[in-house]
Amino acid sequence: MISLILQFMLKLHILGTILSHHLFFPLCFVFSAYVPEDELKAAKIDEEHLQDDGLSLDGQDAEYLCNEEDDGREQLSYQNSPLSNGTNPDAGYGSPLSDTSDHLADFKSTSSKEGQDKEEVEDMDTDAKLSLQDSLAQMKAVYANLISDASWSSITKDIMKSKQVSASSINSTSSSHKGNNSVANSHASTIASSGASSSSNASASTKTNVTQSSNSTKATTLTNANNGTINGANSGGVAYDWHQAALAKTLQHTPYHLMPEPSLFSTVQLYRQNNKLYGPVFTGASKFRCKDCSAAYDTLVGLTVHMNETGHYRDDNKDKEEDRGKKWSKPRKRSLMEMEGKEDAQKVLKCMYCGHSFESLQDLSVHMIKTKHYQKVPLKEPMPALASKLVPSTKKRVFQDLMSPCSPDSISSTPGIPLAETAPTKDPKISNPYVTANNRYGYQNGASYTWQFEARKAQILKCMECGSSHDTLQQLTAHMMVTGHFLKVTNSASKKGKQLVFDPVVEEKIQSIPLPPTTTRLPAPAIKSQPDSPIHPSIMDDRKELEEEKFEEPEEKKIKQEKEDPSERVEKSEKLSHYKYLREEDLEESPKGGLDILKSLENTVSSAISKAQTGTPTWGGYPSIHAAYQLQGSVKSSIPAIQSVQIQPTFNASSLKSLTSDSSTLIHSPSSPSPPPNHKSNVLAMEELVEKVTGKIPSKKDRDEKLTERNSKHLTAELPSPVLKERKDLPKPDDLTKPTKNGTVDKDLEHTPVREGEYKESHADNPIKNGTDALKTQVSNGCGNLGIITDHSPEQPLVNPLSALQSIMNTHLGKASKTVSPLLDPLAMLYKISNNMMEKPMYNPAQVKQVEPINRYYENDDDQPMDLTKSKSGIGPTNNCTSTIISNSSITNSTRPILSTLAEQVSSPLRENALMDISDMVKNLTGRLTPKSSTPSSISEKSDADGCAFEDGLEDLSPIQKRKGRQSNWNPQHLLILQAQFASSLRETPDGKYIITDLGPQERVHICKFTGLSMTTISHWLANVKYQLRRTGGTKFLKNIDSGHPLFLCSDCASQFRTPSTYINHLESHLGFSLKDLSKLSIDLIRDQQAVTKMITDKTFRALDLNEEDSNSIFQCKLCNRTFVSKHAVKLHLSKTHGKSPEDHLIFVTELEKLEKA
C-alpha cells in the first residue's frame, strides 16, 4: 500500500505544480479528517480498477478534463506565474510549497494536521503512520527538486502552457488523471479494494477532489458528505495571487513572507530589479532612490524618512573625495559625477557650510538633514563674482588689487608694527587671493568654507562701488541704500565705455575712495589720541594733515586696507560690540539727534531742485537721494567725505560710539577740522546763485545774521556729528582738548586763515611726528567728511543737488590744475564754467586756481568741492530747503567782502541764464567728463519729462511738448485731433455707460491727410488707448469710463468735462476748427502744400541740374517734399520712410511737371 500511495503521489505532483499545488497538501489532510470511510474505500476501488483495466477516459471525461484545464488557465493561469522561475532558494524566499516557509501553508496545515492526528489515533495503526510520514517526506523532496530545477522564466511560459496538455496525456496513460477525474465525476466502477488503510485512501481521494474543485467550477460530487467537504474547503481557502508572488519573488532581495490577503502595492516594495530579465517593468517611475538598497520613492521626503529609519544614508562629512565615486556606483542611473559637468555639478551641489560636494540632490538633502548644516549656512553671498561683471574695466584692476578695509588679511598680524611699516609691505595680489579666475565663488575644497568665509567676509560683504567692507549683510545694505552706490554700480555696468581717462594717481584715488559710513557718532580715536601729542598748534595740525595726505598717496593701494594703528587695535578689541558701518540701530537712533538722513536728503533734493527748475519738484523719494549723491559722487573726489573713511582706517576700525565716551555731549571734536566748511561754503554759494537767479540778493548784513543764527543753532543742538572745521582754521593747542559746547565761534580760529602755499611750505618742513598724530589728522578728515552727510538738522538737510553740481564742476576743474588763486569768487567761476562749458571743457589756470584749496583729497586735497573758506563761508544766503552746517571753527574773515562784492557784480543776463547754463554744464560734465558714467544726467533726464532742462532744445519746445509720458514727442495738435475723434466714437448705452467703437476708415483717412500720420501710427495709438481703458479703466485724457461717469481731461489746459460732446467742443476750440471740417481742411491743406512745394522743387531741381532726357514728370512726397523721378520710387519712399500703405500712396504723391534746367 505504501508503494501504491507513493506511486500515486509521484504522478499527482505534476498536476499539483501546474495547478494550485500550494493548497493541495494542507487541504488533503483536512479532508481526511472528515470524509467517511466508505467513501474513501469506494474511491480507492475506482482507482485500482482504472489502473488494472487501463480504461481510457470517455469523450465526456476527456472533454471535461480539457474544459477543466482551460478554465484553470482562464481563472488564474498558474502556468504563467513566474513563481518558480529562477527560484533561488538562496534569495531567502520560501516557496509556498514548502511546509515551513509559507505562512499560508503553515496556517492551512495546522488545522488539517490536528484533524489528521485525531483520525490516526482512532483509526490508523503505527505502520500506517510511519508509511504516510515516509511518503510525505519523499514527496517533499520531490517538490523541492522540482521547484529548484524548473525554469519558469518568461521564455518558458509558453512551453509550460503546452506542457499542461502533454502532461494530461501522459497521465492518462498512467491512469493518474484517470483516477482523479473518474473519482471527481463519479464514473468509477466498483472494484475490489486492496488492503490499503482508510487514511491513505482518504488522503488520495481528498487530494484529487480538492485539486479538481479548486480549479474547476464543474466538479461533481462524490457523495453529499464529500461534496460538503469540498465546498467548505473552497470557501475557506484563499486564492493564490500570482502577480504578487511574481513581484515579491522577482523584486525582493530580502526574505519575504506572503500575507493571507496581500495588496499588490502595499506589501511590494519597489526595490531595484535585475533589469536584464524584466527590463523596466517593475522598476517603478520614482525619482528618488536609496543608494544602499535602491528603494525608490516618489518624494524626497519619503526617501529621507527611509534613510533615517534604515540608516542607509552615509555621513559624507567623513568620506574622502576619492572614495566617493567607487562606493556610490549606480548601474542603472548615471550620476552627475560620471557626466561631463561633474565639476560644475559639484560646485552647485555643495554644502554651503562645510564645503562638501555631492553628486546628487538627494545626497545633499540627506547630508543637510543629518548634519543640520542648513541651519548654519551663512546668509551672506559672495559678491566678487558680480563685481567682476559689473565693475568697469578701469576699476577692475584697482578693485582686485585693493583689499577691503576689514579684511583679515588687510590687518597686520603684528600689532606692534605701525601703519607706516605694514602698509607698504602688503602685496595686493597676495592679500587678495579671493578674486581669482578659477576661484570665482570663493569655495574651497574640504570643510574649510566656514573659516574661509570668515577670513574673506570683508571682501565678500564689500561695496562694489567704493570698496568699503561690512560685517553683516544688513550693514552693507544700509550702506548701499544711504550712499546710492547700488545705483551707481548698475549704471556703471551699462556705461563702461564712458570713463574719463585720468592720470594713474588720480584714477587710483577715484576708484579707491568710498563714501563714508553715515553714522551719527564720532570716532573716539580722534579725541583719545589728542593727549598723546603734547603740542597741537593749528599750523602743525595743518602740516600733519597735509603730510598725511602725501603720506597716503604712494600707498593708494593700501587705502582700502585700513591698517589699524596699535592704539586703535586696542580700542577695537576693547569694544568688539561696535560696528564699523551703519547698522539698523544706527538708523533708528539717528532721528534722536535730528539726523533723519533719508528724510533730510529727500527734502533737500526736492526743495532745491524745485527752486532750480521753475518751482516744480521733479525728484522724490529714493531717486532724489541717489541723484544727489551721484551728482556729488559720480566723481568720488567731489565729496570731501569720500576719502576720509578709507584713508582714515582708524575711523572705520574704531567703534562708532567711542566718541560719545569722551565727549558726553556729542559735539564737534576740535581734532576734526576742515572739509565741511568747504561744503557749507558750496551750499552757500549755490544758495546765493539761486537767489541771484530769482532776483533775491540779500544784503551782507542779512547773510551775516543768518550765518550767526545757523551757527548758534547748530552748536547748541549738539548734533552727534564731527566738527565741521576748515583745515586752514585749526584750533589752537588749548582748544584741542576741549570741545566747544556753546554757540560762539572761537575768534582765534575764525581769524586764522592759512594759505595753500603756507600749507605746502609747512607740509615740506614738518613731517608727521608719530602715528598718533597721523591718525588724529586722518580722523579729523573723516569727521569733517561725516559732517557732509550727517551733520545737519532735519529742517535743513545738508546735501542738495546744486551743491552737488558745484562739486562736480570743481572736481573736474581740480583735475585740470593744481595751482590756486583763492581770491577768485567761486560764484563768478561757476558762471564762467557754465558759459564756457561747450567751448572749453578744461579751463585756464586763472580759472582753475581757485579750486586748489578745494581739491584736497587727490593731491593735497585738490579735489575738495569748491572751497569758499577763503571767502567767509557763513555769509551766503540760505534757502529754507538747502541745509548748511556752520562749524564753530570754520569761519574766516577773508571772504566776506569777496562774496558780497561779487554778488553785486553779477550781471542780470547771467542771472537770467544761470539755470540754463548750469543745465548745459551738467549735461556736458556728466556726459563727457564723469569717470563713472553719465548717471547724474541720465537720472535727472529720465526721472521726469519735466526735467527737460537737461535737453538741448529746451527753449524751442512748447509746454505741451515738455509734458510727461510716452507721447511727449507727439505734435499736440495731432493728439488733440486724435482725442477728439476718439471721444466722438464713444457710444452711450441705455444704462448710461459708454462703449468704445472703432474709428471708421474714412475718419482715419481724414486724420491721416491732415496730420500726415501714417495709418499704422493712428491704429497703434487707438489700440494703445483701448488697451489702457480695458486694463485700467482710464488713460491720460479719459478716466472712469467703466463707471458710467467718465471724466475727460484736456491735455492742453487740464480742464475736466463730463460728457464727450462738451469735451469735443472744448478741443475744437483749441484746434480752431471742428472735426466735421477736418476733411475739407485736409484737402485745402494739401493744395496749400502743393503751392508751397512747387517753389521748393524749383530750387531743388535747379540744384539737382536735371538732364533734359529725364522723364517729363517728377513725383513729390507731400510729407517731406522730396522729389523722385518715378512713381515707383516715391511709393517705395512712402512705404519705407513714412510707413504708408500702398493704398494711400496716391494721397501723398504730387506729380510735378518737369522743370527746365536753369
UniProtKB/Swiss-Prot annotation:
Induction: Up-regulated in embryos by all-trans retinoic acid at the prim-5 stage (24 hpf) in more anterior regions of the neural tube, especially in the midbrain, with weaker expression in the forebrain and in the eye primordium.
Domain of life, per lineage: Eukaryota
Protein name: Teashirt homolog 1
Keyword NAD: no
Record's subcellular location: Nucleus
UniProt GO cellular component terms: nucleus
Compositional bias ranges of the Polar residues kind: 76-88
Zinc finger (C2H2-type): 288-312, 349-373, 461-485, 1048-1070, 1115-1138
Keyword set, alphabetical order: Developmental protein, DNA-binding, Homeobox, Metal-binding, Nucleus, Repeat, Repressor, Transcription, Transcription regulation, Zinc, Zinc-finger
Molecular function per GO: DNA binding; DNA-binding transcription factor activity, RNA polymerase II-specific; zinc ion binding
Record field: compositional bias (Low complexity): 186-205, 213-228, 656-671
GO BP annotations listed: regulation of transcription by RNA polymerase II
Species: Danio rerio (Zebrafish)
Residues of the DNA-binding region: 963-1033
CDD domains hit by this protein: homeodomain
InterPro entries: HD, Teashirt_fam, Znf_C2H2_type
Function: Probable transcriptional regulator involved in developmental processes. May act as a transcriptional repressor (Potential).
Chain intervals for the UniProt region annotation (Disordered): 70-126, 170-228, 310-341, 405-425, 516-573, 656-681, 693-748
Stretches with biased composition (Basic and acidic residues): 310-326, 555-573, 693-716, 724-748
Family of this protein: Belongs to the teashirt C2H2-type zinc-finger protein family.
